[in-house]
Curated annotation (Swiss-Prot):
Family statement: Belongs to the SepF family.
InterPro entries tied to this protein: Cell_div_SepF, Cell_div_SepF/SepF-rel, SepF-like_sf
Function (record text): Cell division protein that is part of the divisome complex and is recruited early to the Z-ring. Probably stimulates Z-ring formation, perhaps through the cross-linking of FtsZ protofilaments. Its function overlaps with FtsA.
Subunit-level organization: Homodimer. Interacts with FtsZ.
Primary localisation category: cytoplasm
Species whose genome carries this gene: Synechococcus sp. (strain CC9902)
Gene: sepF
Gene3D superfamilies reported for this sequence: SepF-like protein
Name under which the protein is recorded: Cell division protein SepF
Any one annotated GO CC term: cytoplasm
Lineage: Bacteria, Bacillati, Cyanobacteriota, Cyanophyceae, Synechococcales
Cystine crosslinks: none
Keyword Cell cycle: yes
PANTHER family the UniProt entry points to: CELL DIVISION PROTEIN SEPF (PTHR35798:SF1)
GO biological process, alphabetically ordered: division septum assembly; FtsZ-dependent cytokinesis
């Protein structure tokens, strides 16, 4: 029976091919019976002997796993860029999107353009959950989220910037007491 006649029979509502056996279902039933017989003879260990779950030799049929683009087991790639203008910054963002680490040497750029470039690439790095680190004077490292950046000398070289107003140390009694109210103490 051809495919078209089978489709007509199903659509027309003929009791599924007028009682004809489906060849495919018969083979499935036969395979199920064979598996039951194997399990009854040797138990669950017989089925484990047929296939090794740790065998990585071949692909599993019907596997739904696909690789991530840009991820490889090869060595990580680092791009060193010495841009002369801001127009070259999209190349740095593209490299980060391809999961490559970027080192920007901005000594060839004007200071205002270099600041703009760092802000642009830092924004792109933030968008992909990456990391940024200042390596030296006008040299910056930008890494994607798959790369871990550690700085062994971070404790010695950088400290958080604390902004505070200067307090006159000559009069310690005033700094210890509460400030006078804005409406004036003389009115009370």
């Amino acid at each position: 029976m051809s495919l078209i006649s089978r489709l007509r029979a199903v659509v027309a509502g003929d009791d599924y091919l007028d009682g004809e056996l489906d060849d495919f279902a018969y083979e499935d039933e036969q395979q199920d019976q064979d598996q039951r017989a194997t399990q009854a003879d040797g138990g669950a260990l017989a089925t484990l002997g047929d296939s090794n779950p740790f065998d990585l030799g071949g692909d599993l049929p019907g596997s739904n796993v696909i690789g991530m683009p840009g991820i490889s087991t090869a060595a990580a790639e680092v791009n060193l860029m010495e841009p002369r203008s801001f127009d070259e910054m999209p190349r740095a963002i593209q490299a980060l999107r391809e999961r490559k680490t970027v080192i920007l040497n901005l000594t060839m750029m004007e200071p205002d353009q270099a600041q703009r470039a760092v802000d642009f690439v830092a924004g792109g790095t933030f968008a992909i959950d990456g990391h940024q680190e200042r390596v030296g004077e006008s040299i910056f490292l930008f890494a994607p989220s798959c790369v871990t950046v550690t700085n062994a000398s971070q404790d010695e070289t950088s400290a958080p910037t604390v902004v505070s107003r200067e307090i006159d140390v000559a009069e310690p009694s005033e700094s210890a007491s509460a400030p006078s109210p804005a409406w004036g103490a003389a009115a009370l």
